[in-house]
A protein has these predicted regions:
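Pyridoxal 5′-phosphate
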Residues: 1-383
């Protein structure tokens, strides 16, 4: 039995989304800019998706923009803010545990003279709001904080941070990378004082190559992709109609039972942790109180993550040794370093990430496998 537990890297495409996308590829394949029936038929799918996401996020459809994925959404939010507000200030704040799609554009701006401050986190991966308050300045134009950490699953205090930012720095924008939370944890950006929010299709059983950027009507950022002026000039390029429609379909499926799914996965995760708790020298990373149940980070002492990963692969169990987006460029995890994982354990951490399709039977099987292979792998390591 194949057991896929790398859902934070990507998810299996929804069958309903695939069916809809196939219809669009073969029948409604027109260009949305074309002034004929084929163009209008294609445009209907974009309008329907905008309406759907506006309903999900409780915002206006004019605040929804489609991108090529989470990385583009994050880059647009950060670089677009810098381009539009650069004359007012050159200061941004982010955290020490962001995904590379946020940390890399921040590093890019820093190399061009911007002042970037990084919030530290505690041993569970949570930021300190008092530190955030102390870093806010008159020339701060953007704060970017992820909702759910992609490596350890810690959930940041987004609502409290957003309220603080808008009270202390009313002209500053608040960006949230919600790529690991969207479709799993309900979130209302306007209620949480979020100006910019990024989401990705393939993390919730939609197709790859499609993302979303919510831009609050109060926020004004510059486009970073120029051309034909599509999407009200915010993101040029012919819309990926099949991708957007598939994203919307998949989102509707997961949001239909989002709270029930959350509770079920939380129970499965807790039960799994309990069942492996008798294995010595295993540490659960992240926050016991503030976490996404869809992500479980485990440090297994004296077992190299890559060796562990391939041992599980031999059993047709698929997990991750870190963020898949950076796995082709192996380096020490900035998140694990930030939460003070001991140096000897940095290379002994794996991530199991669940989906709404994950079953009790699958996790019971994984528990049994861990009980058998970890002692065996340690025999070789400890010789």
């Amino acid at each position: 039995m194949e057991i896929y537990l790398d859902n934070s890297a990507t998810t299996r495409l929804s069958e309903g989304a695939l069916e809809l996308m196939t219809k669009i590829f073969m029948e409604d394949y027109g260009n949305t800019s074309s002034l004929h029936k084929k163009g209008f038929d294609a445009e209907k799918h974009i309008r329907s998706a905008k309406d759907n996401f506006a309903k999900i996020l409780k915002c206006s459809k004019n605040e929804i923009f489609f991108t090529s994925g989470g990385t583009e959404s994050n880059n647009t939010a950060i670089i677009g803010t810098a381009l539009h507000y650069g004359s007012r200030g050159h200061h941004m704040i982010t955290t020490a545990v962001e995904h590379a799609a946020v940390s890399a554009p921040m590093k890019f701006l820093k190399s061009r003279g911007w002042d970037i401050d990084y919030l530290s986190v505690d041993e569970t991966g949570r930021i300190d709001l008092s530190e955030l308050e102390g870093l806010l300045r008159d020339d701060t134009v953007l704060v970017s904080i992820m909702h759910v950490n992609n490596e350890i699953g810690t959930v940041e205090p987004i609502e409290e941070a957003g309220k603080l930012i808008h009270e202390k720095c009313p002209n500053c924008l608040f960006h949230v990378d919600d790529i690991q939370g969207f479709g799993k944890i309900s979130l209302n950006p306007k209620k949480l004082h979020i100006d910019l929010l990024s989401a990705s299709s393939h993390k919730l059983h939609g197709p790859k190559g499609v993302g979303l950027l919510f831009i609050d009507e109060r926020a004004h950022i510059a486009p970073i992709i120029l051309g034909g002026g599509h999407q009200n000039g915010m993101r040029s390029g012919t819309e990926n109609v099949p991708g957007v429609a598939g994203f919307s379909y998949a989102a509707s499926e997961v949001y239909k039972d989002i709270d029930k799914n959350y509770e079920r996965i939380e129970a499965l995760r807790a039960d799994f942790i309990s069942k492996i708790s008798d294995i010595t020298d295993i540490t659960v990373n992240g926050s016991a109180e503030h976490h996404s149940p869809y992500i479980l980070s485990l440090t297994v002492k004296d077992v190299r993550a890559e060796v562990f990963l391939h041992a599980l692969e031999d059993k047709e169990i698929y997990v991750s040794a870190g963020s898949a987006c950076s796995s082709n460029h192996p380096s020490v995890s900035s998140t694990l370093k930030a939460i003070n994982v001991p140096a000897y354990a940095l290379d002994s951490t794996v991530r199991l990430s669940f989906s709404n399709n994950t079953s009790q039977e699958e996790l019971d099987t994984v528990s049994d496998v861990l009980h058998s292979i970890i002692p065996m792998l340690r025999k070789f390591t400890r010789k």
